[in-house]
Amino acid sequence: MMASLMLNGAQNPKLINGIAPHGLGSAGLNIHNKCFFRKGVRRNMTLTCSISASRPASQPRFIQHKKEAFWFYRFLSIVYDHVINPGHWTEDMRDEALEPADLYDRNMRVLDVGGGTGFTTLGIVKHVDAKNVTILDQSPHQLAKAKQKKPLKECKIIEGDAEDLPFPTDYADRYVSAGSIEYWPDPQRGIKEAYRVLKIGGKACVIGPVYPTFWLSRFFADAWMLFPKEEEYIEWFKKAGFKDIKLKRIGPKWYRGVRRHGLIMGCSVTGVKPLSGDSPLKLGPKVEDVKKPVNPFVFLSRFILGAIAATYFVLVPIYMWFKDKIVPKGMSI
C-alpha cells in the first residue's frame, strides 16, 4: 500500500510496487512518466507538488529554534511513541523506509542522528548489533526514553547537534536520520555533515515529511517546522556530494496513498559517498543564534500556534483511519 518513488539524480522518477499518490510528486518538474502497478496495469501520471515556504536558518520555525523547542521536546518525549508514531511513523513504515539503507552486515558502524526515543533505532538493531550503533539527539528527555528500551542497552547514546556532529571524518558505514530533518534550522548543513562522517562507499538514509498540499496544513507546517519538497531533499544530497541518490515514498497504510486532506506523507532518501574526506560543499558559519534571549510574549504565541498545529496533525490521521474503515477498499478516500 505504500507508494515508492525512486529518483536517480532527481531524474526519471518512477512509482514502483505501490499505488499512485494523489496530488504530490516532484515539485516544479512537471514530469510525465509511465507507472507500473502490482496488477500489471500501466498508466500515465503527471507529478506535481506544492512549493515549501523558504526561510533562512536565521529565522527558524518554532520547532526549528533549538532553545524554544526544548520544552516541546520534553513534552514530546512523553507522547512520541504512543501518540505520534501510531499516526505518522508506524513500525511498517519504519522498516520499509530503512530498507534502502542496506543494513546487511551486523558489524556495520551506524549513526542514528536525531534518534530521539529510539523508535527508529529499534528497526536498525534488527540488522546491526546494538554495540555498533550510536544514537545522537539534542534532547536529553528523548534520549532518556531510548535508554529504557532493552534492545538498545548496548547502543552508545549521546547528546549532540545534527548540524555539528561530534564524530571524525570517514567514521561510519551508515548514517540514518528519521523524523529529525524537519527540526533542523539548516538542513543543507546537516546533510553535509552526514557526508563528512561517512566512510567512502557509505550510505546516508534521511527519512522525513513532505510538504503538504492542503492550504491549512501548509499554514501550520510553515509556522511549526520544516516540511521539505521532494526535490529539495534531492538537491541537498546532490550539493553535499552524494551519488546514486534515490527517493522512496512512505505513508501509513490507511492513507491508501492519498496526499490530500492535509495528510503528512513522507519519504526515505538515500545517497552514497563516492570519495573519502569532507563534503565538497563549502558553507559559511552557522547563522542560528541560540544565545539570543527569548522574548516571552513571542515564545508564548508561537508555542500556542505550535500546540494547535500539533493537535491538528494528530487528529488528521485519526480522521483518515476512520475513513479507511468506512469507505470500501478500492475506492478513493
Report each predicted region and the residues it spans.
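N-terminal chloroplast transit peptides
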Residues: M1-K39
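A short glycine-rich, Lys/Arg-flanked "PGG" loop and its adjoining helix->strand segment in the class I
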Residues: Q188-K203
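Conserved class I S-adenosyl-L-methionine
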Residues: K203-E232
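A short acidic, Gly/Pro-enriched loop at the edge of an enzyme's catalytic core
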Residues: E163-Y175
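Class I SAM-dependent methyltransferase SAM/SAH-binding core
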Residues: R109-L165
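A short SAM/SAH-binding and catalytic strip from SAM-dependent methyltransferases
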Residues: D173-D186
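Conserved alpha-helix/loop element of class I SAM-dependent methyltransferases that forms part
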Residues: G87-R109, G123
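Core SAM-dependent methyltransferase catalytic element
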Residues: K253-F299, M320-I333
